[in-house]
């Protein structure tokens, strides 16, 4: 088995956890590598170092080390190549982690193929001018649409399958996957949705209304979002650098053509993980 490691070295624990993973993989006889940018930090591990595309295209699995943000970033790189990913927690909650840093002995199950794949729905967002796509991205958790001037409310029109659905006066709207229902969506008052229930969630942020609530749509829904006032909006995918939706343009959000495939080595289910992780916040 060929494995690519993608650690987030801004996490103080990540370097040590990654070194431990390297030791475990070496003992198990697995081939593992990093992308070239990690050469200085991990040259002593005996790993190979390759350009990003070569490493990811040629691997059998990806191991991401860090918190949820790091794992989600790596999951997108893996998903577009139809590669499975295992998250190892070196952050705080890390809902997406399949292993904690004290469970590296379980990596033997990965090498032996003793695991299941947890296939998670992803979203694709296109920024369009008419029928022309002028920008696009994918997300594992959510995409956030706000006014370009973040401190101001904005009027946002939302259409469902090409039919005008609602207009929100709010700070923004959040479109989430079931995976993202335990992230920003949860903080914004959205429902927790089991990831096995494929669906798309829409949550208005601080709506100036007595009735606006989160909504759950079927997985083949296509949501179109644009400014009701001709203002410039911003849309960001999983919290990364936002793209601009200029006046006369709109964002179209729908199910992606592939899934994020998370490796599950342990037998804990969604409710087990939810209770364990959120109990840490009490």
Predicted regions and their residues:
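ATP/nucleoside-binding phosphotransfer catalytic cores, i.e., glycine-rich phosphate-binding loops
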Residues: 145, 150, 161-164, 212-282
């Amino acid at each position: 088995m060929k494995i690519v490691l993608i650690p987030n070295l801004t996490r103080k624990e990540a370097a040590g956890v990654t070194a431990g993973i390297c030791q475990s993989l070496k003992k198990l006889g697995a081939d593992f590598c990093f992308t070239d940018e990690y050469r200085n930090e991990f040259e002593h591990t005996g790993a190979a170092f390759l350009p990003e595309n070569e490493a990811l295209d040629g691997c059998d699995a990806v191991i991401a080390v860090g918190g949820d943000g790091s794992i989600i970033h790596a999951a997108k790189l893996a998903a577009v190549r139809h590669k499975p990913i295992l998250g190892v927690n070196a952050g705080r909650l890390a809902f997406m982690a399949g292993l904690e840093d004290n469970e590296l002995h379980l990596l033997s199950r990965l090498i032996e193929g003793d695991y299941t794949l947890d296939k998670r729905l992803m979203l694709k967002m296109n920024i369009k001018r008419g029928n022309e796509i002028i920008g696009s991205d994918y997300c594992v958790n959510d995409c956030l649409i706000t006014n370009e001037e973040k401190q101001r409310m904005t009027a946002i029109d939302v259409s469902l399958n090409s039919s005008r659905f609602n207009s929100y006066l709010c700070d923004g709207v959040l479109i989430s996957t079931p995976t993202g229902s335990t992230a920003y969506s949860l903080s914004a008052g959205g429902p927790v949705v089991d990831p096995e229930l494929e669906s798309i969630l829409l949550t208005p942020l601080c709506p100036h209304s007595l009735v606006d609530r989160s909504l759950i749509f079927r997985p083949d829904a296509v949501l179109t979002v644009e400014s009701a006032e001709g203002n410039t909006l911003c849309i960001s995918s999983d919290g990364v650098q936002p793209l601009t939706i200029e006046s006369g343009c709109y964002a179209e959000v729908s199910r992606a053509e592939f899934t994020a495939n998370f490796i599950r080595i342990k037998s804990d289910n969604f409710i087990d993980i939810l209770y364990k992780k959120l109990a840490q916040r009490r």
